[in-house]
């Protein structure tokens, strides 16, 4: 007889985890889920195991709104090793080519400039994108290369930090879907020497405050502290969470009176004053502005429900 499935807490919010190096994003997610004893958890765009930095982890009902963070821009600090190209475009891969580093400062500046603004990027074979239902890195591990279409991305800002010997350090502010490993690999080819990532840190995601990032070590320390004080760990852990609607913070807010919100929560579009003419909106209810879901302005100017918060009984 199988054991009944253990249900976690109905905790809703977003934890800004500072992911450690050498850990997969999914492993980090599972550790946070266990620490919080959450019933559901999901991240908002994986970081490579080599990378560190901000990994927003959505808990509970916040997982419904994680898609809006996938569309947000990101900020990275990267250090490239020049003169070596690897099969994964980072230090976790095998060196496949070595070439001398002979470019000038002027050539470097010109090459960097080609990566600023709107560009097309062909994703690495070592990525989680899918081809015919299978992830690209699964093909790559079998030594198979499949066709990939170039995808439009935007590099809002690319700052040169330093070039010392065989190391090049940059800061890159970019749109969703940007592969920093691919930028470095492509840059190495433009410079004629090859390059791969040896250090990568995600500094920011969307408008989340960097100072709210926490490490796994800090979470574990809080759990131990709660045990010593004989209090529930949630009392120390839950205040670290950002609001569940924070992934959609770029969208305008529409507040519904309680007389209208009951219809909205039952799946019906409602009319209200002060709504924008079109697009997605965050919907709140009542004087306290409680978040109840995402809506979209329909052709008749009504706020139609798109994703609703489910309230579980205590």
Curated annotation (Swiss-Prot):
Endpoints of the signal sequence: none
- Determine the domain of life of the protein's source: Bacteria
Q: Name one GO biological process term.
A: mRNA pseudouridine synthesis
Catalytic activity reads: uridine(55) in tRNA = pseudouridine(55) in tRNA
What EC number(s) are associated with this protein in UniProt? Answer: 5.4.99.25
Residues that bind substrate, according to the entry?
43, 76, 179, 200
Q: Does the keyword Transcription apply?
A: no
> Is-annotated flag, keyword tRNA processing?
yes
Active site per UniProt: 48
Alphabetized, the UniProt keywords read: Isomerase, tRNA processing
* Entry GO MF terms: RNA binding; tRNA pseudouridine(55) synthase activity
**Family named by the database record:** Belongs to the pseudouridine synthase TruB family. Type 1 subfamily.
| HAMAP family according to UniProt | TruB_bact
Function, as annotated, reads:
Responsible for synthesis of pseudouridine from uracil-55 in the psi GC loop of transfer RNAs.
Q: What is this protein called?
A: tRNA pseudouridine synthase B
Identify the species of origin.
Answer: Shigella dysenteriae serotype 1 (strain Sd197)
What taxonomic ancestry is recorded?
Bacteria, Pseudomonadati, Pseudomonadota, Gammaproteobacteria, Enterobacterales
Q: Which gene encodes it?
A: truB
């Amino acid at each position: 007889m199988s054991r009944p499935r253990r249900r976690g807490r109905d905790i809703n919010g977003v934890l800004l985890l500072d992911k450690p190096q050498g850990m997969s994003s999914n492993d980090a997610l599972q550790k946070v889920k266990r620490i919080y004893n959450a019933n559901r958890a999901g991240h908002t765009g994986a970081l490579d195991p080599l990378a560190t930095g901000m990994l927003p982890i959505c808990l509970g009902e916040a997982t419904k709104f994680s898609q809006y963070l996938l569309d947000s821009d990101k900020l990275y600090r990267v250090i490239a090793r020049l003169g070596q190209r690897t099969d994964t475009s980072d230090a976790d891969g095998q060196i496949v080519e070595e070439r001398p580093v002979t470019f000038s400062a002027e050539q470097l500046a010109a090459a960097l400039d080609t990566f600023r603004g709107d560009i097309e990027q062909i994703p690495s074979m070592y990525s989680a994108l899918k081809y015919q239902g299978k992830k690209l890195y699964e093909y790559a591990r079998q030594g198979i290369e499949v066709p990939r279409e170039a995808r439009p991305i935007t590099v809002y800002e690319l700052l040169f930090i330093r070039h010392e010997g065989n190391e090049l350090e940059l800061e890159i502010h970019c749109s969703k879907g940007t592969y920093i490993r691919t930028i470095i690999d492509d840059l190495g080819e433009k410079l004629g020497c090859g390059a791969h990532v040896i250090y990568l840190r995600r500094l920011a995601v969307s408008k989340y405050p960097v100072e709210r990032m926490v490490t796994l070590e800090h979470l574990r320390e809080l759990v131990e502290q709660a045990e010593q004080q004989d209090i529930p760990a949630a009392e120390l852990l839950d205040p670290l969470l950002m609001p569940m609607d924070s992934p959609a913070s770029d969208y305008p807010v529409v507040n519904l009176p309680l007389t209208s919100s009951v219809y909205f929560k039952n799946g019906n579009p409602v009319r209200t004053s002060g709504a924008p003419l079109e697009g997605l909106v965050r919907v709140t209810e009542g004087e306290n502005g409680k978040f109840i879901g995402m809506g979209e302005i329909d052709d008749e100017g009504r706020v139609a429900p798109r994703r609703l918060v489910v309230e579980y009984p205590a």
